[in-house]
Every structure is written in structure tokens, then in C-alpha cells.
Amino acid sequence: MKRKSFSMVKKIAVLSMAAILLIGCTGCGSKKSHVRTITNVSYDPTREFYEAYNPLFEKYYKEKTGKEVNIIQSHGGSGAQARSVVEGCNADVVTLALEHDITLIEQTGLIDKGWEQEFADDSSPYTSTIVFLVRKGNPKQIRDWDDLVNKKIEIITPDPKSSGGACWNFLAALSYIKEQTDDEKEQKAFLQKLYSQVSVMDSGARGSTTTFVENQKGDVLIAWENEAITTMKSYPDEYEMITPSVSILAQPSVAIVDDNADANGTQEVSREYLNYLYTDDAQRLAAEYGYRPSNESILKEFSDRFDLNVKLYTIKDYGGWNEAYKNYFDDGAMFDEIYGNDVSSRELA
């Protein structure tokens, strides 16, 4: 198996490569401007959504306060993004893939305790789930998780050590095998077989999409539902999305980085920025970009887009993120055991 570093070259991104590089370089710097500026440090697949959301919020904020605001974005693997904030990235808000990633920042004192209750729905304004993206016609006839281990399939999925989406991918697969057996040895064997068939392991979800789409590697991409929808929009005749019978409710989280926002004088606008995610306009926009709105009535408006019948485990089924991370993703936990036992070490040519 080959682990790859995150690539900034992405055909399906709305931003040009130059703009992405500019954001990556300036997103965590100082803020000296007459216009209020806040930095949103986010994870890989949200870039298109926030590119659309930011102008919507800027217009709302100008109409409400008479003041202009500029939003700087920074994107990458969720775990790596959290570490960048801990190491000094001047984020005003974080919109990350996992509650656990924000908890890591909280533990440094940068985010106040109780952030999970600061916004509605446990500070999760939109959700997603984990699906399969396959090439048009589904040549390998992949329908469910069993197909990934029973057939000669090359899988693309990112690395849970750096990607929040990859952690959700792992838990989605585990949720499926838990439905089949209570035997922990059988569950682990299933996961080990699945990960032995991962041919490229990128550092982030968008990097894995690039590997699958741009580089034409692998037979199936295990992906966020919203990432699959975005890819099919960009390549309407080339890919199909397969929703497995069992998956997990992936709940990205948002928070104000209180110490930074206080120092930058942006606490008020940062709060407005995250609160606005829960408005009807923003919820519908999230749905347009493939995220499941937390507002149930708006979610039902998009029932033709989202499979609302799939069985979804939640992180609570795993004891919450602290427990799940300790059991599966910490050094020496189950993922490391599986990865360490992968003796194939296959690489794509």
C-alpha cells in the first residue's frame, strides 16, 4: 500500500490552483485591513461549499451591520488542519470533519470548553455519510461492502492519521461488519482484508479523489457522499455513486477559535458566520453542494438527492469520539494493527 501526500492540483475545485495556493499561504497569517477579515480553517471537501457560502454570508452581514467582511479559506486533511491551528495558524473559526479534531484544539486552551453546545445540533450544521464512487457502468459490479473484500478490487481511501473523512470511512466499514457478526476477530479480519486492497492512501479526502479521478487509479473510491455528488456534477457521464446498505452518519463540527477571535477582534463576526450556517438559505445551499442539512424539513426537500433509508450508525454507537479515537485511530490502536499487518505493500505503477 502506498501512502501519498496531499496534492493541490484538483480539476474539480472551483478555485484555480493559484488561488488555492494563495489561500494556503495567507490563510494563517496576520490580519491588517480596514475590512473585517476572518479565517475559516476547514477540511478537504468543503472548499466548493464555502466558496459559495462566503459571498452569501458577506452580503447578509453587510445588510445587517453595514460592515464589510472578507473570508479567507484554508483546506486540507482535517487532522492536519487541526494540528496547524495548534501550531499557530491564526484561525478565527474551524469547520472540521470530526468533533475529535476540534477537541484537540480545545485541549490547548485555544477553544473554550463547551463549544459542542455553542451552536445547534451539537455544533454540526450539516452532515454527510460514506458512499462508493465507481466508474460509469460500475464495471466491477460493486454494490456493498462485501464486494470490496470478496472481489479483486483496488480501493482508494485516505489515511485516518491525517484525514477526518478517512476515520469516517473506517467506521462506516466497521458498522457494516458489525451488522453481520458480533465476533471481534471476524470484524477485524474483514477490515484487514479491506485495507489490504487499498492501493493508494492519500493524506486527505480531496487527494484521494484526485488519485481516483485525475490519475485514474483504483476501481472504487470510498468517499464522503458530498464529495461523490460534487465529482458527478463535474464529470456527469463518467462516474456513479453507490450507497451501501450500512454506513455512518458523518457529523462535521464547527467552532470559534476563541483565543484567536478575541485577539483579532472577530468574536462577534465569527459567531455570526457560524450561526448563519443554520439559516434556511445556507441549509439549502449545503444541500446543493451534497451535504445533508441538519434542518430535517429542508433535508426532506432533497429526498431525491439523498438516500434517507440507508441504515446509519452514529459516533454514539462507538462511545463518542474520544472512545472511538482511542480504540481505532490512536497510535497502536486497531487501524495501526491492520496497517502494520498489511504485508502486501502494493503500489500502483
Q: Where are these predicted regions, by residue range?
A:
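C-terminal motif of bacterial Sec signal peptides marking the signal peptidase cleavage site
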Residues: 23-27
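Short beta-strand->loop
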Residues: 41-43, 134-136, 153-180, 194-198, ...
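N-terminal segment of the mature folded domain
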Residues: 32-162, 309
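Ligand-binding pocket segment of bilobal, Venus flytrap-like solute-binding proteins
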Residues: 180-245
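Extracellular/periplasmic juxtamembrane helices and adjacent flexible linkers that interface
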Residues: 261-349
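Bacterial N-terminal signal peptides that target proteins for export
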Residues: 2-16
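Short helix-loop capping/hinge motifs at secondary-structure junctions, enriched
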Residues: 137-143, 162, 175-183, 260-268
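Periplasmic-binding protein-like
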Residues: 124-131, 191-195, 202-203, 234-267, ...
